[in-house]
Regions:
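PLP-dependent enzyme catalytic core of the Aspartate aminotransferase-like
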Residues: 1-8, 128-129, 137, 155-158, ...
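N-terminal "arm"/small-domain region of PLP-dependent enzymes with the aminotransferase-like
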Residues: 2-70
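Conserved PLP-enzyme active-site core in the AAT-like
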Residues: 11-12, 17-26, 89-289, 294, ...
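Glycine-rich beta-alpha junction loops
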Residues: 25-27, 40-46, 195-197, 217, ...
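Conserved N-terminal alpha-helix of the aminotransferase class I/II PLP-enzyme fold
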Residues: 43, 48-97, 122-129
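Short amphipathic alpha-helical segments
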Residues: 61, 87, 226, 255, ...
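Acidic-histidine catalytic/liganding microenvironments
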Residues: 83, 284-288, 336
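Conserved C-terminal alpha-helix-loop-beta "cap" of PLP-dependent enzymes
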Residues: 290-378, 382
Length: 401
């Protein structure tokens, strides 16, 4: 009897590690190939005039032109939507293409938007500078000022945009609180969840309207492609898809293939990066030459309780400040042998960047410090190397201080 009852139970949804491999794929594979085919074409042809009319007048689903979509991209979109728990998804040629196209599809002249102040520099620049040309007002608020956020909402506010975790301080937005504020005023919520990935955080489960991902990072995971995505309910994603068809920003089929290949191992990689980042953060926090460490799953992080409540892992980025001067910071960085000096994150190689010298080189010291970008601030994006080797390399650099 117990066996019979167990058969009647609803089937358990496959785990994310399984879905990262199989979601979006037809069981019957093309030419019996186990891997997704790269459909490298600009145009999809019609057999005859009847097939054209079935497509244009009767709405038969098929492909027409690669800027509007293709088979390889469709599989990537289905898999990403499954992992994020979204109804729909559009993939783009980069994360910034996803962000800018999404924003432009949601606003009109005379509208108002709100964005938090520690969002990605290029996202802030787009909202602060370029949207003015379309007569769209942008309010930039300090991250975590929930009271100020509610006061900033106007009748013409279209959406609230933030990252979570943010770059570089890894601040965590209380997604449930954000949704409640937005719901009271009927505005949309957009979260860039690139630093978390759907493995660690799924904002849609908290009622967020749209999630953005730079698939360049953890999802593809090998530092070899650019890709982006927006995910959410179909009614919203369709608006973005329509503008995407006109704006371009189309991802290449070969990049889609590499994204799909990367997705198959992304749960394994992110699990490793979560563990390594936490080990590195704990080691640095005790180091006498380190001033401060920022990592969401450290109890010393200001948003530790929020992070552990809405995330399953802290991610692969550790931000820290060394003691000393800018010259000392340079000595530390130049002594590293394993960690590569460079921007980006989420790949298999460990990367370290110095925001003051790279992202904010064109800011005055006063401007940088107002944003919290100090002379000795570093962002470490751990790869999948051995944690002990990464720590040993950091020790090599810290020995120079």
């Amino acid at each position: 009897m117990a066996l019979k009852n167990s058969r009647n139970k609803q089937k358990r949804k496959p785990a994310i590690a399984t879905r990262a491999i199989h979601a979006g794929e037809p069981r019957k594979r093309y030419a019996d190939s186990i891997t997704t085919p790269i459909v490298q074409t600009s145009t999809f042809v019609f057999a005859d005039s009847n097939e054209i009319e079935n497509y244009t007048r009767k709405g038969k689903t098929r492909y027409e032109y690669a800027r509007y979509g293709g088979p390889t991209a469709t599989i990537a979109e289905k898999r990403l939507a499954d992992l994020e728990g979204a109804q729909d998804c559009v993939v783009f040629s980069s994360g910034m293409s996803a962000i800018t196209t999404t924003i432009l599809s949601l606003v009109h002249s005379g509208d108002h938007i709100i964005i938090t102040d520690d969002s990605y520099k290029k996202t802030l620049e787009f909202c602060r500078s370029y949207l003015k040309q379309f007569a769209v007002e942008c309010t930039i608020l300090p991250f975590g000022d929930y009271e100020g956020l509610e006061k900033a909402i106007k009748k013409n506010t279209r959406f609230i945009f933030s990252e979570s975790p943010t770059n570089p301080y890894l601040n965590i937005f209380d997604l449930e609180k954000l949704r409640k504020i937005a719901d009271r005023h009927g505005v949309l919520t957009l979260i860039d969840s690139t630093f978390a990935t759907p493995f660690n955080q799924r904002p849609l489960e908290f009622g967020i309207d749209l999630v953005l991902q730079s698939c360049t990072k953890y999802l593809a995971g090998h530092n070899d492609i650019l890709a982006g995505a927006v995910l959410g309910r179909t009614a919203l994603v369709d608006k973005i898809r329509d503008l995407h068809k006109s704006m371009g920003g189309t991802i290449d089929p070969h990049c889609c293939y590499l994204l799909l290949r990367g997705l198959k191992t992304f749960p394994l990689r992110v699990t490793r990066q979560n563990e390594t980042a936490l080990a590195v953060a704990r080691h640095l926090e005790k180091h006498p030459r380190i001033k401060r460490v920022y990592y969401p799953f450290l109890e010393s992080h200001p948003h530790y309780k929020i992070a552990t409540a809405q995330m399953t892992g802290g991610g692969g980025v550790v931000t820290f400040e060394t003691k000393g001067t800018l010259n000392d910071a340079k000595k530390f960085m130049d002594a590293l042998k394993l960690c590569f000096i460079g921007p980006s994150l989420g790949g298999v190689e460990t990367l370290i960047t110095h925001p003051a010298l790279v992202s904010y080189y064109d800011y005055t010291r006063k401007q940088r410090y107002q944003l919290g970008i100090t002379d000795t601030l570093f962002r470490l994006a751990v790869g999948i190397e051995d944690a002990g080797d990464i720590i040993e390399d950091l020790e090599r650099g810290l020995h120079q201080l």
